[in-house]
Regions:
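Repeated loop/turn-to-beta-strand initiation elements of outer-membrane beta-barrel proteins
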Residues: 16-20, 55-58, 108-112
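Residues on the lipid-exposed face of transmembrane beta-strands in outer-membrane beta-barrel proteins
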Residues: 5-11, 46-50, 100-104, 160
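Residue-level preference for beta-strand/loop junctions
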Residues: 1, 38-40, 54, 94, ...
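Outer-membrane beta-barrel signature, preferentially recognizing the C-terminal barrel domain
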Residues: 65-121, 131-132, 137-160
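Short, solvent-exposed loop/turn and secondary-structure capping segments
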Residues: 33-34, 71
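Surface-exposed extracellular loop regions of Gram-negative outer-membrane beta-barrel proteins
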Residues: 1-33, 41-45
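Transmembrane beta-barrel strands of outer-membrane/channel proteins
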Residues: 22-28, 60-64, 114-118
Length: 160
C-alpha cells in the first residue's frame, strides 16, 4: 500500500500582477520501516509569478520532491524469495529543485516559456555490485534495477 496527502494555498494580488503558490506533500508506503513515516517524506514547494510588463512574466519555483525507487528495485528477490533491497534500507529518492524563467502569454490558450533549472538528487539507488548509480546505467532495452542496491548515490541535473 502507498498513501499521501497534499495541501496547497494560492495567493493572487488584486491587480493579478503577482501570484504565489505554497504547497506541502507527504508520501509513505508499507514497503519498509524507512518508508512508513510520512514526516520522513515531507515535500514543501513554492512557486512565484510576477507580471513584468504586458504579457511577460517572471516565474520562480523551488521545492523538495520524493519519488519511489523503480518497482524492479523494490521487488528484487534473492533465490530464497526474500526482498533484498528491503533489507538494504531502501528509501524514497529525494530531489531538491529550483527554477527561474520568463514566460510570454500572447493569449489565454497560448504561452511560451524559457526556464533554467537545477536539481540535486540524494538517496538515489546505487548498485551494490559495481557501485554505479542506477541513473547512470541506462537500460539498453533491458530491465533496470533487478539487483541489490543501497540508497546512497547523489547527483545533479541542470539546464534550460
Amino acid at each position: 500500500w502507498k498513501w499521501g496527502l497534499y495541501a496547497t494555498a494560492i495567493y493572487e494580488s488584486d491587480n493579478e500582477r503577482f501570484t504565489a503558490s505554497l504547497g506541502l506533500r507527504a508520501d509513505a508506503n508499507n514497503y519498509s520501516s524507512k518508508m512508513k513515516n510520512m514526516l520522513d517524506q515531507l515535500s514543501p514547494r513554492l512557486s512565484l509569478s510576477y507580471r513584468i510588463a504586458g504579457d511577460i512574466y517572471l516565474n520562480a519555483n523551488a521545492g523538495r520532491y520524493y519519488e519511489l525507487p523503480p518497482y524492479t528495485v523494490m521487488g528484487f528477490k534473492d533465490n530464497d524469495g526474500n526482498y533484498v533491497n528491503k533489507g538494504n534500507a531502501l528509501q524514497y529518492i529525494r530531489s531538491d529543485q529550483a527554477g527561474l524563467g520568463l514566460e510570454y502569454r500572447p493569449s489565454s490558450f497560448l504561452k511560451f516559456t524559457a526556464e533554467g533549472f537545477y536539481k540535486h538528487y540524494n538517496r538515489y539507488p546505487m548498485s551494490v555490485i559495481d557501485s554505479i548509480p542506477l541513473a547512470s546505467k541506462g537500460t539498453d532495452y533491458g530491465v533496470m534495477g533487478n539487483e541489490a542496491v543501497t540508497s546512497t548515490a547523489t547527483g545533479r541535473a541542470y539546464g534550460m
